[in-house]
Amino acid sequence: DGAASSGNGLNILNEARTAALVQRHDHWDPTLLPAKDVFNMITKDSKDWVAWDLEDFRMFPRGRSNNRHLANLVFNGGNCLDMWVDGQAIRLNGVTQTIDERLALENLDNAVDSYYEGIE
């Protein structure tokens, strides 16, 4: 079935949020899988790195001691600015480096239009 119908969008933050919420619900314990533990689960032993925009509205409120960044990121998502995988820059300053996003979206629109022309 896959990502096209599961709704996860291949976003690791969405998956992390779902993991925490499912455990909390399943065990009726809102203290299970705090954001710090969830973040460690998705980054443990990783040699890749990502930088998020801490000024993104989803990163607020920051809390009295400015300590809510991980909780905001895990439970609200965030705007990915930079991403490096195996030493290669995938995103820099919020711009994908490995593909032309506009062209990819245009190709997707054209493929969907072509598909529906054949069945409508």
Across the structure, where does each feature detected by a protein language model lie?
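Active-site loop ensemble at the mouth of alpha/beta enzyme cores that anchors a bound cofactor
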Residues: 2-26, 32-35, 39-40
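Fold-independent oxyanion-binding glycine-rich loops
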Residues: 1-2, 54
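Active-site microenvironment of metallo-dependent hydrolases
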Residues: 7, 17, 36, 43-120
